[in-house]
Amino acid sequence: VLELTMAAVSAADEGATAGMLMADAPSEAGAVLRVGRDKSVCRLATPDDWLFVSRVHLEFLCGPDGGWQVTWLRGSQADPSSEVRMTVGEYVQPIAYGGTVPLPRGGSGEIVVQDRTAPRSVNVGFYHEG
């Protein structure tokens, strides 16, 4: 099982957990969870006017071995208006635009989509059961 929690954080309400969304999916090959502005395909939807987030920004996909990975999907712009990084414990790893990284089995962490032009972010916490 992969469990996700998402909070949209702006400078005005930093530290607030109001509006936190949650989603989970079984660790079965082909299972998908998406994060973005498009509510029709994203289980975790961000505010419509947060244009630094793509319609479908992050895709969590379960592979045939039950391991999960996250991909920062390329949007309609050549240069993204956000930065994405994954934190696991003390380790911080930037995720490249269009890049994919595996999630640690039996581990937890956070993926942050940071607006490049304003002090706001989308924080997605994850827990991947081993």
What are these language model-derived features?
Residues 1-50, 61, 100-130:
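Intrinsically disordered, low-complexity acidic Ser/Thr-rich regulatory segments
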Residues 52-55:
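Short coil-to-beta strand junction motifs in C2/discoidin
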Residues 57-114:
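Forkhead-associated
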